[in-house]
Amino acid sequence: TVAGSPYTISAVLSPTGVLANYDITYNTANFTITPKLLTVTADAKSKIYGLPDPALTYVVTGLVPGDVVSGSLIRLPGENVGSYGITVGTLSAGSNYTITFVPADLTINKRAITIKADNNGKIIGDPDPALTYSITSGSLAYVDSISGALVRDAGEDIGDYPIRKGTLVINDGNGGLNYELTFVEGVFTIRQMLLTVTANPASKVYGAADPVFTY
């Protein structure tokens, strides 16, 4: 093994019967075992923002049969969308090897979410109700939240008005960049006012003119 190096090299002469004919000087030499080169190639990985990290795996080239690689890879810290380098971490094959590490990246991709404005409306002349929305696909991660307000196109005449995204934003500590946000507009409808007219009962004497009808 490398740890046991250097080893002493000595010579044995034969046949032993002829040694008396020589004046022999013994000079020793060292036999050194150098570490074997081992290539560890990290596998590229990816995940969606907010999900746990996948297992970090690798491919080994040059390992002697029976020997093992222990320890684990690590990646650079961070949970926002982007690429993070995978490093050798605690990987080791022992003192008999020198590791050449080929790095890779763990890529965090955006989290998809769909927000739809709820359809709403009012009677002409009334104040606008609060505009609301629903998450129809996907979800928020961690303690992320949504803030801001929807808006509708201006107008007070009878008809339909689009409800738009307005100032709605996702608070994720990264300017909302950790999400792939799809916004679906809603419809705000201004309707006619319903007017009920109730006629008052009336009567007359036969042959007389009709009275004035009231309501």
Q: What residue spans do the PLM features occupy?
A:
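Solvent-exposed beta-strand/loop surfaces, strongest in extracytoplasmic domains of secreted
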Residues: 1-215
